[in-house]
UniProtKB/Swiss-Prot annotation:
Lumenal side: 1-27, 77-135
Superkingdom: Eukaryota
Name under which the protein is recorded: Translocon-associated protein subunit gamma
Membrane-spanning parts: 28-48, 55-76, 136-157, 164-184
Length: 185
């Protein structure tokens, strides 16, 4: 049986590995899929009110395309977040280190080892990078998706039947942001 100190060290290592992995927590997944569903459903209003596609007659089409688009947009969120997280962590490292060191100096830090201080700084840096990368990923992908839908709908596919216009503009927009998100920028 492993000693308790080794078990604690293993759990700390697992937490660090989890922070740098591509896997999302349940909270992040819910946030991404919730936002992706909302932004994917917005074009329904556009096609219902402007292109006069009936809600009831097109309900199945709206549902299928919204679900497909939700998956692709959430996929783009995840990829962009992962790429940005490390860049943000590098840029914010000095500021986060100063803030954590200042807070620790205000508190009683004489009892704290250098390793524990470094772990707190790393944890805070990772938390800040995760938050900033998540919010920027959602903002960037939502903006790009909605701009692509509007451009495709009103300019590129304006002479198509509204049903074909909807299918092509939603699938092309969500597919394009999912494709663009796979690049390493």
């Amino acid at each position: 049986m492993a000693p308790k100190g080794g078990s604690k060290q293993q759990s700390e290592e697992d937490l660090l590995l989890q922070d740098f992995s591509r896997n999302l927590s349940a909270k992040s997944s819910a946030l991404f899929f919730g936002n992706a569903f909302i932004v994917s459903a917005i074009p329904i209003w556009l096609y219902w009110r402007i292109w006069h596609m009936d809600l009831i007659q097109s309900a199945v089409l709206y549902s299928v395309m919204t679900l497909v688009s939700t998956y692709l947009v959430a996929f783009a969120y995840k990829n962009v977040k992962f790429v940005l997280k490390h860049k943000v962590a590098q840029k914010r490292e000095d500021a986060v280190s100063k803030e954590v060191t200042r807070k620790l100096s205000e508190a009683d830090n004489r009892k704290m080892s250098r390793k524990e201080k470094d772990e707190r700084i790393l944890w805070k840096k990772n938390e800040v990078a995760d938050y900033e990368a998540t919010t920027f990923s959602i903002f960037y992908n939502n903006t790009l998706f909605l701009v692509l839908v509007i451009v495709a709908s009103f300019f590129i596919l304006k002479n198509f039947n509204p049903t074909v216009n909807y299918i092509l503009s939603i699938s092309a927009s969500s597919g394009l942001i999912a494709l663009l998100s796979t690049g390493s920028k």
